[in-house]
Curated annotation (Swiss-Prot):
GO CC annotations on file: cell surface; extracellular region; phosphopyruvate hydratase complex
CDD domains: enolase
Cofactor(s) of this protein: Mg(2+)
Residues where Mg(2+) binds: D242, E285, D312
Protein's GO biological process: glycolytic process
Record-level Gene Ontology MF annotations: magnesium ion binding; phosphopyruvate hydratase activity
Family named by the database record: Belongs to the enolase family.
E.C. no: 4.2.1.11
Keyword entries, A-Z: Cytoplasm, Glycolysis, Lyase, Magnesium, Metal-binding, Secreted
Protein name: Enolase
Organism the protein comes from: Nitrosomonas europaea (strain ATCC 19718 / CIP 103999 / KCTC 2705 / NBRC 14298)
Upper lineage: Bacteria, Pseudomonadati, Pseudomonadota, Betaproteobacteria, Nitrosomonadales
Catalytic activity: (2R)-2-phosphoglycerate = phosphoenolpyruvate + H2O
Catalytic site positions: E205 (proton donor), K337 (proton acceptor)
Length: 428
């Protein structure tokens, strides 16, 4: 009864108003699995390829009708009749059908939509929530959220070079209190911005997008917001920064335009280390450019024992690249973005490889999101212990937090909140 009898894709709209793909997988029993795919603005050069139409007369070239055609044609014909319970086999079949190294022929967006829809259909057929179907009886850890409070870089129309300034409520007793904490700090920050006559418009990921005179001003104001909201900076609420440094790495230097600086790799390491000394920063993402592996080595040597150093663009959820990074002692954490690699199986493999190497794995959204909540279930299913899914505004971000709250309720007394233990690679 779990045989696939129909696969249908369609073009829908994401949180930035751009087209993306949604797929339905129908089983013989009548059960339906549905999944939609996110899209990034800050994109690593080695990510799996998102297939766009390139027709300037339609959505300015961003349509996904070619990806829809891939699903409704070749992919549908190939997986029709297969057992939805055989996730690994189906994903392997999709990868082989595409035949390219980076899923550029059929499109990683087309392949991923089907891969996730298959998993959802199989979970429904099994009578299990998705997190339990994927993770089994040990899926009980609720991840620590990394909550985006200030947007910059390519995620906002402001002067900030850094892409994200986040709070991390690691000292709270459970997820529900962590979410409350995030909402209260977010509200307090809005009040502080209003008092300074700064705009409270939000960026792609729901964080505020004011134009500060310097990057560091965002950190100082966030610490003030944490304190005025009634929480302890550091012990209860730490800070994370996504530099997205590949976006401002040019001709061998890191150009921080708002600060008027052009820094070498070593100088940029010093710059970040100064922030770590002044503020309760526990996590830095993409602290070095994806091209600057030597810089990554310097950063890891300097801060790798006390700060979570997250590789996003440098690893792109790819086990081959992650394996090389582990062997060269690059970073100590990986950001997991399901559309960077393009199938559920490969995503789970990357998480497992990271954990086996003592790296943390952070399940992440993209700047262009939908109402799909799959990443919340994946975070719990894999005991990833951390999730990055935006701010406490915009329903595309809140959908994931609300799904985590439902999972916590579903787990009942079995639910455990990771808290500070989520940063197991750091020395106390």
């Amino acid at each position: 009864m779990s045989a696939i009898v129909d696969v249908i894709a369609r073009e829908i709209i994401d949180s930035r108003g751009n087209p993306t793909i949604e797929a339905d997988v129908l089983l013989e029993s009548g059960v339906l699995g549905r999944a939609s795919v996110p899209s990034g603005a800050s994109v690593g050069t080695r990510e799996a390829v998102e297939l766009r139409d390139g027709d300037a007369q339609r959505y300015y070239g961003k349509g996904v009708l070619k990806a829809v055609e891939s699903v409704n044609g070749e992919i549908s014909e190939t997986i029709m009749g297969l057992d939805a319970m055989e996730q690994c086999f189906i994903d392997k079949t999709l990868i082989e059908l595409d035949g390219s190294e980076n899923k550029s022929r059929l499109g990683a967006n087309a392949i991923l939509a089907v891969s996730l829809a298959v998993a959802k259909a199989a979970a429904e057929e099994s009578g299990l929530p998705l997190y339990r179907y994927l993770g089994g009886i040990n899926a009980k850890w609720l991840p620590v959220p990394m909550m985006n409070l200030v947007n910059g870089g390519v995620h906002a129309n402001n002067r900030l070079d850094m892409q994200e300034f986040m709070i991390i409520p690691l000292g709270l007793p459970n997820l529900r209190e962590a979410v409350r904490c995030g909402a209260e700090v977010f509200s307090t920050l809005r009040t502080l911005l209003n008092k300074r006559n700064l705009p409270t418009t939000v960026g792609d990921e729901g964080g505020f997008a004011p134009s500060f005179a310097r990057n560091e001003e965002a950190l100082a104001l966030i610490v003030q917001a944490i304190d005025e909201a009634g929480y302890q900076p550091g012990s209860e609420v730490a800070i994370g920064v996504d530099c997205a440094s590949s976006e401002f790495f040019r001709e061998g230097k890191y150009h921080l335009d708002v600060d008027g600086l052009g820094l070498t790799s070593a100088q940029f390491v010093d710059y970040l280390a100064t922030w770590v000394e002044k503020y309760p920063i526990i996590s830095i993402e993409d602290g070095m450019s994806e091209q600057d592996w030597e810089g990554w080595g310097l950063l890891t040597e300097r801060l790798g024992k006390t700060v979570q150093l997250v590789g996003d663009d440098v690893f792109v959820t790819n086990t081959r690249i992650l394996k090389e990074g582990i062997s060269r002692n690059i970073a100590n954490s990986i950001l997991i973005k399901i559309n960077q690699i393009g199938t559920l199986t490969e995503t789970l493999n990357a998480i497992e490889m990271a954990k086996c190497a003592g790296y943390t794995a952070i399940v992440s959204h993209r700047s262009g999101e939908t109402e799909d909540t799959t990443i919340a279930d994946i975070a719990v299913a894999t005991n990833a212990l951390q999730i990055k899914t935006g701010s406490l505004s915009r329903s595309d971000r809140l959908a994931k937090y609300n799904q985590l709250l439902r999972i916590e309720e579903d787990l009942g007394e079995m639910a455990q909140y990771a808290g500070r233990s989520a940063f197991y690679q750091l020395k106390p």
